[in-house]
Amino acid sequence: MMIRGIRGATTVERDTEEEILQKTKQLLEKIIEENHTKPEDVVQMLLSATPDLHAVFPAKAVRELSGWQYVPVTCMQEMDVTGGLKKCIRVMMTVQTDVPQDQIRHVYLEKVVVLRPDLSLTKNTEL
């Protein structure tokens, strides 16, 4: 098995606990579905949020996923880059897998599709 990174990101319209958790959970569920990821294969998960999000830690959404309570998770603040995407939540999931790197399915939803138009799933913003 190899260690691979699975990337994902989404945006919210409002800085509310409900929307941040809902959009983060939606993103995580799509990453899990697309990559057939099981909690026991996840080494760690890093989540970041842009500085304009304060209502809740996005990592709280991981705890709402059945069986994911033992996955090591941490949150951090994304760099505040001039012209950068606002109200954005990013995920880096480190997993053990036999899947070749070029077959990992990264997931970019909502306004984030502009960040990685080269990846196939960025074309699909509907779940």
Curated annotation (Swiss-Prot):
GO CC annotations, alphabetized: cytoplasm
Reaction(s) catalysed by this chain's protein: chorismate = prephenate
UniProt-annotated binding residues for prephenate: 7, 74-78, 90, 108
Keywords, comma-separated and alphabetical: Amino-acid biosynthesis, Aromatic amino acid biosynthesis, Cytoplasm, Isomerase
Pfam families: CM_1 (PF07736)
Biochemical pathway: Metabolic intermediate biosynthesis; prephenate biosynthesis; prephenate from chorismate: step 1/1
CDD domains in alphabetical order: AroH
Family matches, as PANTHER family: CHORISMATE MUTASE (PTHR21164), CHORISMATE MUTASE AROH (PTHR21164:SF0)
Listed name of the protein: Chorismate mutase AroH
Native organism: Bacillus subtilis (strain 168)
Organism ancestry: Bacteria, Bacillati, Bacillota, Bacilli, Bacillales
Gene from which this protein is expressed: aroH
